[in-house]
């Protein structure tokens, strides 16, 4: 983990919660399962990781890897709000471009 999201959250007064070692292993297994196109298995790993976060009273999790949202779509009842970092980056990029008039005919 690079620490990018943690630093950004702290700069906004939000204290990040890192997944425990077992949850990190489940997240890694989730990513590997997605790469192997084993989406149901990936969702199971992700569900276990999210359950550990929920027990720690975490209500929002950043999906900071492109494979995780693929597994998340297969979840049935995620009780932790999931933020897709790739989707949010795309939204911010479009907003940035629109604010500057990029793509408009002169």
Features from the language model and the residues they span:
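Non-catalytic structural scaffold of enzyme domains
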Residues: 1-106
């Amino acid at each position: 983990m690079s620490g990018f999201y943690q630093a950004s959250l702290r700069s906004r007064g939000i204290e990040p919660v890192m997944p425990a070692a077992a949850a990190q292993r489940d997240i890694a297994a989730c990513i590997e399962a997605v790469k192997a196109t084993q989406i149901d298995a990936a969702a199971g790993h992700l569900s276990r990781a999210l359950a550990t976060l929920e027990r720690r009273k975490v209500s929002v999790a950043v999906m900071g890897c492109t494979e995780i949202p693929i597994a998340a779509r297969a979840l049935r009842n995620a009780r932790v709000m999931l933020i897709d970092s790739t989707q949010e980056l795309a939204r911010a990029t479009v907003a940035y471009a629109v604010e500057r008039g990029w793509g408009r005919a002169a």
